[in-house]
Amino acid sequence: MSEVLQRITDPKEIKDLDEKELEILAEDLREFLIESVSNTGGHFASNLGVIDLTVALFKNFDFSEDRIIWDVGHQSYAYKILTGRKDKFNTLRQYGGLCGFPKRTESEYDFFATGHSSTSLSSAAGMARAQRLLGKDNKVIAVIGDGALTGGMALEALNDIGYRKDNLIIILNDNQMSICKNVGGLATYLNKLRMGVGYNKLKSDIGSTLDTTSLGKRVKNSLSKLKDGIKKIVVPSMYFEDIGLKYFGIVDGHNIRELNEVLSIAKNIKGPVIIHTVTKKGKGYELAEKNPNKYHGVSPFDLGEGVISKFSSRNYSSTFGEEMIKLAKNDDKVVAITAAMPDGTGLKDFREEFPDRFFDVGIAEQHAVTLAAGMAAEGLKPFFAVYSTFLQRAYDQVLHDVCIQKLPVTLCLDRAGLVGEDGETHQGIFDISFLSPMPNMTIVAPKCIDEMEVILKWASNFNAPLAIRYPRGGDIDVNLKPLSKIEYGKWEKVQEGEKIAIVATGKMVQHAMIAAQKIKEEKNIDILIINATFIKPIDKELLNSLSKDGFKIVTIEDNIKKGGFGEGVLEYLNEIGHKEKIVTLAFNDKFIEHGKPDILYKINGLDAEGIKNTLIELL
């Protein structure tokens, strides 16, 4: 590493660097990021792709006054390093350390927290309008990827920005990827723009030549009237300019000179500007350049060997994908939908085997849910695989388009519960609370991976709205047998016991088993453990029996307490006059920050030791 990065103590110092020093700084950042993220894990390929752009932004703007919003925010590592967080980068995504996304409480340079996609244009427009109303003239910049631009919220914002003529700069970071390869009409359109790069060079070359003479300038002014027609011929449908944005592109996102030139022009233009840069995910690390999907998000790895794929342990996502293929082979009405996450949700092989029955809609959860509703209305059996945190974006569609009509759409909520290092924007701890109040909705959760298979088979013949929630990763080493069959609304006694009954959902049954074993060893008391396969509806018959037999009851869930499973059980037990103690174990009314799940469960009293301590207090 050279001395350039080492000597930067204030981002304003970057403005004084010459072009060669800027290029050296970019290389220093790449070297630092590759070394650091290989040790901590984190978002890798996307960050390597925006380093040159980040350096150019600091050269042209003063972020003690100007504003920048990174859409999704996973590509903000270089920005964090240059804004005083380099020495803390070894704590990235660790409990108490740096967040992997922009966070307003972490730095004065993080102007808006992000984590989910497609939000930057709306927030940037809001900031630009606030600047205008407050009499300020600071620049507002939004950096958004071509994947995030497929999100409906981003398109809504573009429509409004073009109409209102907000004074902001949009930088389209076009790497032809979100996590996986982009799909859809907008991706096709951007590809046409990339193919039409010759138009922009042709326009520049002609303009430069004509500017050299007075006659040429008059000719240039006349030719400018033909600009729209030329665009229609050479570059199909200049969408951005048609809706009111000044378009600059295509710009090489790894050429600092080009970036400086276009940014120096854009910052002096009033009104909305979009700069279309083309970058390469994984730039500077050959293995990531060749396989950007594999290097999107990584665990710690050896730089010489690269990321090694792990095939030894089963997990919920891969099991879901395997079972979906089995269902589809036996039932030609089964279809799978994902919102730009075929690999993460385990549907990659399904896509290969059933391409006509697989639908990747891009980053468009709202569309995905109502698409599924339309399919269900015509007799298909749609399964929408989505991370729990991202289903929040389609609340109205689940309620309005699925539940009101009681359509048999199956929502497969991957990453339900804690996801760990991605932090508060990604923890899947709200789905029980926002789905439970919806009439006609049924919510289930497998207690182990093997039970996932049984539930999916049952779900394929369930004729009403259904949500299946399951966690990231695999099982704890607990000996559990899956249910042999599913009986609607009924729970399962996993272990007989006395005095205290634990009613747990999903993987929390495994935590309960370990806690109960500790009680057995320390107190020689058996704890009754119940697997609440059905989160909604609750098993009232079994609860009546527990109350009649005088059990103290502890509910356990990896969801927030408010509006959760435990509150539903508590409400019913109060209705029937249950006289013994009731304890609900869940996440309290707060957002759960980033860190390893084991640490976060412990801090929140939901690990086996915390559950054991609660049980001891009740004995």
UniProtKB/Swiss-Prot annotation:
Q: Which GO terms describe its cellular component?
A: cytosol
Q: Which sites bind thiamine diphosphate? A: H74, G115, H116, S117, G147, A148, N175, Y285, E365
Pathway membership of this protein? Metabolic intermediate biosynthesis; 1-deoxy-D-xylulose 5-phosphate biosynthesis; 1-deoxy-D-xylulose 5-phosphate from D-glyceraldehyde 3-phosphate and pyruvate: step 1/1
The protein's name is: 1-deoxy-D-xylulose-5-phosphate synthase
Q: GO: which molecular function terms?
A: 1-deoxy-D-xylulose-5-phosphate synthase activity; magnesium ion binding; thiamine pyrophosphate binding
Organism of origin is Clostridium perfringens (strain 13 / Type A)
One biological process term from GO is: 1-deoxy-D-xylulose 5-phosphate biosynthetic process
Which InterPro entries does the protein's record reference? Dxylulose-5-P_synthase (IPR005477), THDP-binding (IPR029061), Transketo_C/PFOR_II (IPR009014), Transketolase-like_Pyr-bd (IPR005475), Transketolase_BS (IPR020826), Transketolase_C (IPR033248), Transketolase_CS (IPR049557)
Subunit structure, interactors included: Homodimer.
**Pfam families, A to Z:** DXP_synthase_N, Transket_pyr, Transketolase_C
Q: Which residues form the signal peptide?
A: none
What's the record's note on cofactor binding?
Binds 1 Mg(2+) ion per subunit. Binds 1 thiamine pyrophosphate per subunit.
What cofactors does the UniProt entry give for this protein?
Answer: Mg(2+); thiamine diphosphate
What Enzyme Commission number(s) does the record list for this chain?
2.2.1.7
Q: Give the binding site residues for Mg(2+).
A: D146, N175
State the family it belongs to.
Belongs to the transketolase family. DXPS subfamily.
